[in-house]
């Protein structure tokens, strides 16, 4: 898969100052990317656009040459820094995990997710245990 940003620009107010403009890049399959910068410079906003949470003011995001889906599952996933804010506290972990579609057993085992954790609620897990579920969910489908 190739994730491509084509000339994307963004501002929080449609006619306000741009947070960033005309960004272009491609991320190839199995390539890792690092986005450094101080707080407030748009790193998280850029990631939200790449994952389809926000729309750019200009430009487009493509996955294998096609726009990201507007509805349903998006194959571009974001793993949030604070896992407790990324899950529904009313759902058991088994349901939260299935939000990402089918997660392979090798991923669950590789992350060290224990079977009895599946029947717990998020607040019954440590931050590290909860983050493992968020990573597994992002790797699903």
Describe every region a protein language model picked out.
Residues 2-5, 9-22, 114:
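A short, flexible loop at the N-terminus of ABC-type nucleotide-binding domains that lies
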Residues 36-38:
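The feature captures the beta-strand-to-loop junction immediately N-terminal to the Walker
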Residues 51:
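Helix-to-loop junction immediately C-terminal to a conserved catalytic motif
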Residues 66-77, 85, 91:
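ABC ATPase NBD coupling module
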Residues 95, 121-125, 129:
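Conserved ABC ATPase signature
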Residues 103-116:
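Conserved ABC ATPase "signature" region
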């Amino acid at each position: 898969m190739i994730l491509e940003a084509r000339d994307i620009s963004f501002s929080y107010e449609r006619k306000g100052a741009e947070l960033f403009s005309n960004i272009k890049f491609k991320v190839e399959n199995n390539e890792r990317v690092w986005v450094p910068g101080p707080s407030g410079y748009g790193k998280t906003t850029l990631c939200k656009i790449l994952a389809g949470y926000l729309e750019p003011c200009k430009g487009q995001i493509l996955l294998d040459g096609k726009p990201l889906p507007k509805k349903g599952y998006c194959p571009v996933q974001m793993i949030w820094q604070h896992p407790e804010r990324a899950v529904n506290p009313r759902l058991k972990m088994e349901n939260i995990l299935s939000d990402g579609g089918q997660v392979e057993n090798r991923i669950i085992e590789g992350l060290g997710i224990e079977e009895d954790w599946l029947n717990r609620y998020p607040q019954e897990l440590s931050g590290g245990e909860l983050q493992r579920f968020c990573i597994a969910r992002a790797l699903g489908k």
